[in-house]
């Protein structure tokens, strides 16, 4: 039986999320037979999910920002080897009471993997997310103009990161 509530709550929900991933890797037949994983964190409906996934061309797909210290993770693609050798070893560093979130730990793992030769790319475009409140179980209001700005920013960011000068 899985007990996902064994840890100090001050560590945060990211700590619990990683514990779920670790448990799945160790106990799930499906996870043990799979080589690539797609994670959608949070209570999200990603409206352009298929478009993002159909345009993944590298081993790792993840957005990273805030001077490469924050791996924004509404939709990520990770190979199992990355999860086992980079992501899970960083897991114990999560402590939201100290400002160390799962996104910070994920960025450390991502940068270590890139330094070791993994290929990485930004998402094809920014995810268009319909978010659901965990407290009220209601959808947050979507702002179409905001989504358009985010989409164009993501295209520019991808161009700058991936252009060969």
Which ranges hold each PLM region?
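ER/Golgi luminal nucleotide-sugar-dependent glycosyltransferases, focusing on the catalytic module
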Residues: 1-165
């Amino acid at each position: 039986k899985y007990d996902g509530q064994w840890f100090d709550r001050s560590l945060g929900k990211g700590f619990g999320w990683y514990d779920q991933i670790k448990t799945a890797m160790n106990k799930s037949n499906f996870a043990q037979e799979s080589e690539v994983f797609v994670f959608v964190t949070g209570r999200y409906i990603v409206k352009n999910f298929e478009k993002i996934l159909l345009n993944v061309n590298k081993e790792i797909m993840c957005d990273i920002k805030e001077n490469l210290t924050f791996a924004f993770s509404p939709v990520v693609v990770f190979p199992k080897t990355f999860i086992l050798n980079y992501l899970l070893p960083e897991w114990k560093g999560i402590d939201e009471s100290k400002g160390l979130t799962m996104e910070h730990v994920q960025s450390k793992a991502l940068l270590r993997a890139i330094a070791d030769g993994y290929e990485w790319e930004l998402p094809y475009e920014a995810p268009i997310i319909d978010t659901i409140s965990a407290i009220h179980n209601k959808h947050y209001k979507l702002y179409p103009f905001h989504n358009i700005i985010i989409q164009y920013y993501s295209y520019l960011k991808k161009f700058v990161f991936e252009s060969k000068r």
